[in-house]
């Protein structure tokens, strides 16, 4: 595997604020499934590194970054993938996931500072159903 638990839980905000952003056993299991069914297949297909911008968030970290109260990041079911301002790469990853991989929610997102990322979540079938919800709010051109 190309992904580590450390990178899936890394957070500059958690470091700065002294937040212990450690997942429990169930959250770790969810992260492993997310890697196995979405992140690793994406990495192998794209043949390029996939950088995690935001992965697991404990409740305190989720509040600190302004995450929604029902964020799948808190369950270990979601990550935001960095595309480093490369919308072509972001669109390629987004389209590949949508057409080829299981997912619960897939969003091409941005913030007011001009940062862009791909949000993807996955729910292992034993724990719920994947909705295959797609939100592409950036590339309406």
Predicted regions and their residues:
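Extended, low-complexity, intrinsically disordered C-terminal regulatory tails
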Residues: 39-65
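Generic non-transmembrane alpha-helical segments
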Residues: 37-46, 92, 96-100
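Catalytic cores and adjacent binding grooves of peptidoglycan-active enzymes
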Residues: 70, 75, 83-141
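Short connector loops at helix/strand junctions that flank enzyme active sites
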Residues: 45-47, 74-78
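Extracytoplasmic cell-surface/polysaccharide-interacting catalytic and binding patches
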Residues: 1-43, 134-141
């Amino acid at each position: 595997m190309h992904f580590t638990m450390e990178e899936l839980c890394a957070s500059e905000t958690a470091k700065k604020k002294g937040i212990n952003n450690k997942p429990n056993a169930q959250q770790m299991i969810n992260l492993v499934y997310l890697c196995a069914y979405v992140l690793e297949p994406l990495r192998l297909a794209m043949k390029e590194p996939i950088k995690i911008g935001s992965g697991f968030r404990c409740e305190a970290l989720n509040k600190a970054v302004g995450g929604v109260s029902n964020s799948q990041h808190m369950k270990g079911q979601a990550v935001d993938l960095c595309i480093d301002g490369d919308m072509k790469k972001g669109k390629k990853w987004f389209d590949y996931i949508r057409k080829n991989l299981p997912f619960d929610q897939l969003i091409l997102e941005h913030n007011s500072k001009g940062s862009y990322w791909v949000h993807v979540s996955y729910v292992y079938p034993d724990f719920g159903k994947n909705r295959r919800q797609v939100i592409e709010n950036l590339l309406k051109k």
